[in-house]
Each structure stands twice: as structure tokens, then as C-alpha cells.
């Protein structure tokens, strides 16, 4: 299971990074595997490597603030307003931050980043694999998802994410699908 998939800089041939491990992983003694890859600024040199000779056992005691991550979510463009009109296949985007770290591993029952449309289990999607940490950070990142074609009319979307201390947050977006509406393009 992937615990962290992030990016950072190499400085003078060396690198360092920090990440937080979700509270609900299996803490049985064992070994882990780290895969590394690098590319220079000009995209002309690449390097790869791995390390599997390290142990995993136990964790540091951390104060739990009992507050879930902050989530800023929208459909198609940051100018989206809750209750606004969208095309039949809108793009969902969420920026997530938490000072303790974001759980993007999905370890633990029910701790996935999950998007649900109209409260239907058949329209529930796990977005863990779509999540990308911001460069050099384990406390912020984003995820996105192209929603399947939706019927015209009013819909509701709920998105839930967790921090590494098992505190969830949920955001709800209300929107109206208008057939033939061209999506607003945002890059």
C-alpha cells in the first residue's frame, strides 16, 4: 500500500523530505520500500533508485486537534458558485490542506477520499489515486475527477477527505446541469 507519493527538490545533489503516516496503518514490525526518481530542470537527465533496507515499527505520539482538513471545492472553474449551472459532465476539483497531513493512502475502513453524487452508492467514487500533494508538502494537495454524464436538473455532490489523525471533513456542492451548456475552461 502506498503511504506517500510526493515531490521535492534536489539541492547540491542531496534531497530530504518529510511526510506524515496515517494513524490507522498496520503498525506491525516490518520493512518498507521507497522508490525515487528525479529529473533535471531541462528534462535531459533522469535518475532512479530504491531503498528497501529500512524498518517500520511504531509511531510518534501526536496531539489530535480533532479538526478535519480544510477543503475548497468547485466544479469546472474556481468562479463556480454553489447552486450554479454546469454542463452534463462537469469536472470536480478540490484543494485540501491540514497542518497534520492529509490521508491519501486510503488505509483504514472508510478513510478514502470519496465523492458521492445525489447520495447514491452507485455514484460514489474513490479519488485517492487522483490526489497529488503540492510540491514539497505533505499538508496540502489537490484531487480532481471528471463526473460521468448527469441528467438535466438539480444535483448534489458530497466530497469527504481525512487527515492523518482520522479526522474527516465533508463539503457539499449543489448544482444544476443544463444540457448543451459549454463548460467554462480553466487551466
Show the residue positions of the predicted features.
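Long, low-complexity serine/threonine/glycine- and acidic-rich segments characteristic of extracellular
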Residues: 1-59, 72-83, 87-89, 93-180
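Proline-enriched interdomain boundary motifs that mark the N-terminal boundary
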Residues: 64-75, 182-187
Amino acid at each position: 500500500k502506498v503511504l506517500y507519493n510526493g515531490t521535492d527538490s534536489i539541492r547540491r545533489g542531496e534531497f530530504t523530505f518529510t511526510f506524515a503516516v496515517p494513524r490507522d496503518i498496520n503498525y506491525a514490525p516490518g520493512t518498507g520500500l521507497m522508490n525515487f526518481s528525479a529529473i533535471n530542470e531541462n528534462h535531459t537527465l533522469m535518475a532512479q533508485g530504491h531503498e528497501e533496507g529500512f524498518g517500520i515499527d511504531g509511531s510518534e505520539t501526536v496531539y489530535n486537534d480533532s479538526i478535519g482538513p480544510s477543503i475548497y471545492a468547485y466544479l469546472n472553474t474556481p468562479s463556480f458558485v454553489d447552486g450554479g449551472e454546469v454542463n452534463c459532465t462537469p469536472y470536480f476539483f478540490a484543494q485540501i490542506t491540514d497542518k497534520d497531513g492529509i490521508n491519501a493512502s486510503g488505509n483504514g475502513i472508510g478513510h478514502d477520499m470519496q465523492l458521492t453524487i445525489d447520495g447514491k452508492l452507485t455514484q460514489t467514487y474513490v479519488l485517492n489515486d487522483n490526489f497529488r500533494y503540492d510540491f514539497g508538502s505533505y499538508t496540502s494537495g489537490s484531487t480532481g475527477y471528471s463526473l460521468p454524464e448527469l441528467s438535466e436538473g438539480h444535483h448534489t455532490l458530497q466530497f469527504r477527505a481525512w487527515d492523518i489523525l482520522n479526522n474527516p471533513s465533508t463539503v457539499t456542492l449543489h448544482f444544476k446541469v443544463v444540457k448543451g451548456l459549454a463548460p467554462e475552461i480553466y487551466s
